[in-house]
């Protein structure tokens, strides 16, 4: 899959396109994310990948009731927020399709293709799963009501750490717990606990979270 990503990058850079503006085929745009040499658009009926020169690279009709996507550099994950299926896509083709045991809340994907998934959990508040770029499970964390449910996630630029902002209720107040997970060790570290709901979470450098 890594070789395929490199091949795609070289091929996309050389592909002629029709240029812009043009119709992309997405009637009602819900999300858009940049990829290397291209971008992906999500509409209510599926998503489309276009090169920066205006060449259509991929088109996916998922049939998901509540589709959402998260993107890295060369891959993106398309998932169903009303179901338990996700698809990991390169810019030109499907790499993996996975059915999880429980409904999906949220996904994030790193620049190297590491995937984080938050699902419902029968015995706790939520479960955080992390998969390698080859879809081998690296981490599983059953999160209690005190831990909260992740509402925002972001991988570090080097893809070695995952920040997660999890929302919980304490004393009638909505609180956010910010965790940092080193993927090599798998141990979550609580960084801060504060009131309110996070609107955005990201890395401004290799070591700074905003």
Q: What residue spans do the PLM features occupy?
A:
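A short beta-strand motif characteristic of beta-propeller blades
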Residues: 10-24, 53-61, 92-99, 137-143, ...
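Asp-box/WD-like beta-propeller blade repeats and closely related beta-sheet repeat scaffolds
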Residues: 95-115, 119, 126-127, 134-152
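Structured, soluble extracytoplasmic/luminal domains of envelope-associated proteins
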Residues: 49-105, 110
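Short beta-strand elements that form the blades of beta-propeller/WD-repeat-like
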Residues: 30-43, 47-48, 68-81, 86-87, ...
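Beta-propeller blade-edge and WD-like acidic-aromatic loop motif
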Residues: 46-51, 84-94, 125-139, 172-190
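Repeated scaffold domains used in trafficking and secretory/extracellular systems
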Residues: 25-32, 62-74, 102-111, 147-154, ...
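Gram-positive cell-envelope targeting signals
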Residues: 1-19, 30, 76
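Extracytoplasmic/luminal low-complexity segments enriched in Pro/Gly and acidic/polar residues
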Residues: 161, 166-210
């Amino acid at each position: 899959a890594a070789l395929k990503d490199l091949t795609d990058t070289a091929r996309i850079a050389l592909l002629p396109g029709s240029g812009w503006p043009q119709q992309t085929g997405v009637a009602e745009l819900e999300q858009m994310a940049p990829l290397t040499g291209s971008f992906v658009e999500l509409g209510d009926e599926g998503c489309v990948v276009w090169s920066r020169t205006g060449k259509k690279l991929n088109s996916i009709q998922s049939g998901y009731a509540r589709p959402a996507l998260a993107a890295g550099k060369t891959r993106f994950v398309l998932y169903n927020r009303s179901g338990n299926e996700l698809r990991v896509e390169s810019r030109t083709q499907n790499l993996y399709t996975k059915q999880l045991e429980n409904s999906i809340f949220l996904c994030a994907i790193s620049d190297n293709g590491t995937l984080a998934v938050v699902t419902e959990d029968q015995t706790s508040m939520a479960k955080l799963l992390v998969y390698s770029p080859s879809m081998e499970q690296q981490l599983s964390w059953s999160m209690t009501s005190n831990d909260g449910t992740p509402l925002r996630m972001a991988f570090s630029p080097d893809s070695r750490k995952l920040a997660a902002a999890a929302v919980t209720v304490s004393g009638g107040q909505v609180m956010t717990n910010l965790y940092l997970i080193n993927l090599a060790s798998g141990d979550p570290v609580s960084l801060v606990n504060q009131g309110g709901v996070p609107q955005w979470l990201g890395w401004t450098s290799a070591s700074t979270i905003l």
